Structure formats: C-alpha cells, structure tokens
Amino acid sequence: MMMHELPVPIHQSPGSENHSNPASREQSKPKKETERRLPSGAKVDFGNGSGSKKQQSNQKPKKGSDSEKKKANRANSPALPNGEKPNFYNDNKEKNKKLLDPSLPNGAKPNFSFYSESNSNSNSNVSSNSNKTKKKVHEQSLPSGEKPVFHDKPNKKTSSSNRPDKNGKKGPVEETYAGSSFHSSPAALNLPKPSFQRTSPKQQANTINDENSSPSSSASSVSMSSPRPVAGAVAAPPRYPVTAYPPGSIPGAVPNVPAGYYPPQYAQPQYIQPGFTYNVNPQGYIQYQYPPFHHPLAPAQIPYQQHPFPVNAQPPAHVGSAPQGQKISFDDLLGSAKK
C-alpha cells in the first residue's frame, strides 16, 4: 500500500492522545537551559537572561566623590574634537543676552541710532552740556567728515512759508515741478502768448496797422511787403531729390543722357505673314513658307518679299522621290470640309 492510502483514525478521545504519546508530556515540562560558555570558559551574557537581572539588582548605587561625578558629566556632555564644549545658548538667559548682543570684530558695539531730534519736552535738570554730548554721539558723518542728508527733516524754507501768520493765514505755497525754474524765468515770461479768440476782419486790419506803425514791427512789415507766391502758380519740382540713388540702380528709370544725344534707331524688319499658300507632302503634312529670322538690333536690311507659287505651276520634283500630291487652295479645303 502506498503512504497516502494508509488509514487515518478520525475520532480519538483526548485521553488516548496523552497515553499514546508520552513524548508530549516531556515536551510540556520546562527544560533547564544548558549553560553556554565561550571558548575561554566565560559565560555568555546577552543581557536578557535572569542572571543579568539579578546582578543588576545586587549592584547598589555607591556614593562617589565629586571628581567622579564630574567625570560622569563630562562623559555624558557633548564635546568638540578639540575638547571644547559646544555652546547651544540654552544655559542662562543673562548669558544669552550678552552673547546675542551685536558687536564688531574689534569688540566695539555698532551704533544704529539716527539723528537725535531736539527734545522740546526735555527735563530741566539735564544740563546743556550733556545734551550737546548726546547729540555729538548720535550724529552720523561720512568718512570725509560731511553730514549725510536723508531728507527726513522739513526744510526751513518750506516750513517758514507754510507757517500761518498772526492773522491765521498761511503764506504762499511755492510749487516745484520739472521745468518750474524755466517757466518762472524772464525768457519764458516774455514769450508771446497765443490767443484762441475768433477775431473779426476789422480787428485783424487794426492789428496789422498797429504792427506796421510800431517801430518794433519793422521786420514784419518788410516780410509783408515782400512778394508772395500766387496760390494758382505751380510749384517747381525740387532740383535735388530727397533720396539720391546711384544711376542705373532703379529699374525702368531713364539714365542721365546729355541733351541733344539720341541713340541710333534701327529699322525693324516687317514680318510678312506667310498667308495661306502651302504645299502638301505625300505623307499629308502641310508645309508653310516662313521668312528668315531677323535680329532686332541688326542693321537695316531689305525686307523679305515672299513670292507665292502660281496656282497652275507644279513644285520642283525631287529626284528619286515619289510624286507629290495635288496642290489645293484654302477655299477648296474649306469647301471639301463642308461637303
């Protein structure tokens, strides 16, 4: 029988299992752990056994000297590789304040204070000498010794102009803007002012007479007496154009030809239309007679005169060729097509 065909008991009582398997009882009993030792003979201690706990309980804390405590603190406290202690700024608040105060590399404290304005409500007990020394300390200066201007104080001129008078009225306010210095200059004030009012022809005549009578308008009278161009006259073209191009650069432009020079003109030959006289080959192709080719710039030649063949004459026969077909006119050809 095979192993998978062996009968397996299904119903078994719990008591029968204990009696049948004595090895299970031995497994249920706790076994004593065998002591494991190192090759040197020392016991192996992993720190998780009962023996280690007993040893820890047996060890009582001993009161050591101050030097031992310091050594323990040194061992627990962090230290840099060179032996110095790192400063985390968490010891005391007073120490932190001292350390957080800004200082220059030479140890001096920087002065971030601005101009000290004069205190109108200063105490009477403070002497004038002490106030002067304070102002000197707070005043800033450039390396050249000059005082910087931050434009954070009102100017004396503007403050004096804005102060109200005894009657409670403020003084004139001067407006400053870009170009105000030129607009207030006498050269700008003496410029003629334009008038946009519509004037009648009588007023225009009066103004013209006043200008002519005044000595200052002598230049204007001279300009008026000078001849003026008539409105209907055609203006002459400009002698020199605005854009000067080199000759020959503009296509279609007439080149600069001296006066009295005319290029030679050749007589162009007249091309005579071949007409409707033609010859018919034995193969049935029609041959037209064309005039010879003429160059347009060639010298004048005698025009080509076409000599049509007579109707009754026969074309010259070629030696050794088949006889040609009958010569017909264009009218006969059209008549045959209509039929």
Swiss-Prot record:
Start-end of Low complexity biased regions: 111-131, 213-237
- Superkingdom, taxonomy of origin: Eukaryota
Subcellular localization(s) per the UniProt record: Cytoplasm
List, as start-end ranges, the regions of compositional bias called Basic and acidic residues. 26-38, 91-100, 163-173
Biased region (Polar residues) positions are: 13-25, 196-212
Instruction: Mark the transmembrane ranges.
Output: none
Q: Which Gene Ontology terms of cellular component type are present?
A: cytoplasm
A single GO BP: nuclear-transcribed mRNA catabolic process, nonsense-mediated decay
Predominant place of localization: cytoplasm
Pfam families membership:
PNRC (PF15365)
Region (Disordered) location: 1-240, 309-339
> InterPro entries per the record?
PNRC-like_rgn
One annotated GO molecular function:
RNA binding
Keyword annotations of the record: Cytoplasm, mRNA processing, Nonsense-mediated mRNA decay, RNA-binding
Family assignment from sequence similarity: Belongs to the EDC family.
Role of this protein: mRNA-binding protein which stimulates mRNA decapping.
Please identify the protein, giving its name as recorded: Enhancer of mRNA-decapping protein 1
Source species of the chain: Scheffersomyces stipitis (strain ATCC 58785 / CBS 6054 / NBRC 10063 / NRRL Y-11545)
Q: Which gene encodes it?
A: EDC1
